[in-house]
Structures are given as C-alpha cells and as structure tokens.
Amino acid sequence: MMMTACDDGRRRVYESGDKGESWTEALGTLSRVWGNNHKGHERGVRSGFITATIEERDVMLVTLPVYSNSNENEKGELHLWLTDNTHIVDIGPVSEKEDDVTASSLLYKSGEANEEELIALYEKKKGDGESSLGMVSVRLTAQLQRVKDVLTTWKEVDERVSKLCPSEGATEDTSTGIACNTVKITDGLVGFLSGNFSGNTWRDEYLGVNATVKKGANGVATGYADGVTFRGAWAEWPVGKQGENQLYYFANYNFTLVATLSVHGEPTEGDTPIQLMGATMNNKNTVLLGLSYDKEGKWQVLCGGKTAKELRSNSDPGTTHQVAIVLQNGTQGSAYVDGQRVGDAPCELKSTDSKGILHFYIGGDGGSAGSKEDVPVTATNVLLYNRPLDDNEIRVLNASKVSIPKLTDLKTLAAGTTGVGTARHFGANGDGSADCGGGLLPLLLLLGLWGIAAS
C-alpha cells in the first residue's frame, strides 16, 4: 500500500496486488479519509504507516496530525489511528500539544504479551524561530492497550450483528427460500447504530462515527433497548460534515444503508411525505438518494432531489419494515423495502465526486420537524456498508429483521425526554482519477507489498 498527500487537500491511499506493477486507488476503504489541507501549516506532515497482527487480526496503524476547527494556525496534535481496512478509529494523541511535528514513524515489536512494544518516533521543530529539528521517541503502552480494547469491541460487535442473521438453524425466508447462512452480513460493514443512545448522541457500536440527533421546536427522540423513536426529530450520521478527516468518505462512491423501521401512523391530508432515510449532498442540502412514505401508503424514492419511483404498501401503520438505499459507482441509486426493489431499475445520478455527501439522515430530515402532526418513526439496527449489497443480500437481511413493538401511547412520547431509560409504552405485539503528481510529499510512504484481506 502507498499513501500520499495530494493538491486536492486529501491523502490518497493506493493498493497493488501485482508486486507494484500497477496501483489502484482504495476509494472503498482508506483513500481520501484523512485531510491534508490545514491552512497556515506546511504542505503536510509525513505520516507513520505500518501493518501488524494484533489480537489475531491484521491491522494498520497510522500517525497523522489532528487539528481543531477553532484555530487555523495551530500546531496539529499527532494522533494514532487504527484500521483493519474496514473500520477506522482515532486511538488518541501521541505528541505534546506544543510540539510542531513535521514527520513521524512507527515501530512495533511483537512477541509474548509482556514483550509487545509500540513506539512512535517523530520529528519536530525546536521552536523560537529555529529551523533545526529535534527527534522524539515515545513508548505507546497505553495506546497499544487501547488498540487491543478496540479490536475486542470490533469482534464482539461482529458477533452481535451475525446473530441478527443466524448461520445455523437454517433461518430462511419462506417466500424466497433464501437462508441466512448464504451471506456473511458483516462483510464490508463499517457502522452500526443500535441501542447505544443518550443525550443527543446515537453512538456507533464500532466506535467510529456517531450520529447526532436533531430536533424541531416540539421534537422528541426517545431511546429504547435497540434503537430510537423520533417525533419531530431525526438523526444525522455525518460524512463530509466530519470535517478534515472523513471516516466515511467511501460513501461518495459506494454504500449500502440498511435500517429496520416502523412508521407509527400516516401523514394526514396535505402533509408532506415522511422522509425516512437518505443521503444529503453538500450543495444546498439536496437529497442525493432517499426513501419517503406518503399519506396514500406509497413508498417513494428520491433521486437527485426528485421523486423517481414509487411502491404501494399494503401494510398497516406500525408494521415493521426493513428499508435500504444503495449507491454504486457514485452514479446509480436503488432503494428497497422489505427486500423488494422500488422500481425496476436503478435511478441514474450525477457523480457525487465534486460535491460530496454531507450526511445520512434517519427518521426524518428536518423538513417538517416541529409540526404537531409529526408521525413517530422508530429506527433500529441501522447498518452502513462500504459496498453496494446485491439483491440477494438485501433479501437475506430482510428475512432476519426483528419486529419493532407497536407504539400505543403518543402522549407519553411527546412528554418524554431524550435519552436512554425514557418511558415508552408498547403494545403487547410484540471515480478517483485526479492527478496527484504535483502534490506528492517529499517522502512517499511505500510499505512493501502486502494487503489486508477484508474479513
């Protein structure tokens, strides 16, 4: 693998599977995740970049500076990042805040548990106007333990998600004959929102990017065991909104967003459709791809800000549905309801490369938030993939969806507070071809010829 800083302000990662004869940009995973465009700072800090096997998992460790948004001229604090080529976590700071770091490197020694060592070497300016540089060596004992803790969490969450679709016991969709054991539902799974909700934060179970709850004037978001119920409120899961470092940059090219939802009612006459889930662009908040539900009981696909396709629903309000939106190659969008594609073919989209996705929205988009007629929407088991799932995989996921209890007391919800433990009443039923040549760092980080196989 190879990482380089480019003139467009982002660090690109390239992969080679033929001993360096050809290189392909890793747009679906690590490329363009980290920024290189901090104003008032030199072109870029050379990063440390190594691979290792820790806790029986192939991972990559990277050191790169992190800047706050408040001070454009500040010195970036060097942070350690962990990735397994699917998930990415900021482990935390390595350098001192006053250090003006210009380059860094990592050393990892494996062996028995008490012999493992992770060391960061970084070059810094001495300050006081001096042009000479100094070297610092830091033993990252606490950071290595944090790496192990994160890897343990990833493993545990993988196991939890896998149980949503048991591979044994021949769990099968009787209408399609598709068994859960035909698909590995954690393949390419980057983010997972479930029951970890408090305050205005819906936390990613993989410790990556958290979603933030937004509310209208009368909005309420209420957490329960496995998800959140929104009324006049919604969740935003940031992509471009993350700032300089965008862990979900892959979503501008390929993604699948899946959620189990229940709409506790229907829009009344004259009301706009309920915006259930979608991806909002950076330009004037245009919806790139989304799914809504109208007063006539029809599912509508929003494609490039316009309603493109519809599918009539024969179910009653409060029925549990699994919905999904899929983006392929940044130009083709599809939507699914209960494993069935809405429309016969994908809708054609303009490339997202130049504008970029701002965030995903779930449970609403703020368009009509605050209205007394807002219909509650419950969302649970929200899954974000870094690849487009095919029709078969969508059907398999649908076959394993968990039923959401019906909401019976809307007055209690309206009076509730945001956070875990709020009272809830349920019924008994249960492309990437831009030239980087002029933006290469003096030191190009080339790590031998290896690859991390996505597990």
Regions found by a protein language model. Give the residues of each.
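Structural motif
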Residues: 9-15, 70-80, 126-146
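Loop/turn-rich, solvent-exposed surfaces of beta-rich toroidal or solenoidal domains
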Residues: 10-11, 35-90
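Beta-propeller domains
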Residues: 1-45
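Extracellular glycan-associated modules
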Residues: 164-431, 452-455
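Cleavable C-terminal sorting propeptides in eukaryotic secreted/cell-surface proteins
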Residues: 432-455
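Blade-level signature of beta-propeller repeat domains, shared across WD40, Kelch, NHL, RCC1
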Residues: 103-171
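Conserved blade-ending motifs and adjacent loop-strand segments that build the rim/top face
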Residues: 28-46, 84-112
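Entry beta-strands of beta-propeller and related beta-repeat scaffolds
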Residues: 1-2, 55-62, 112-120
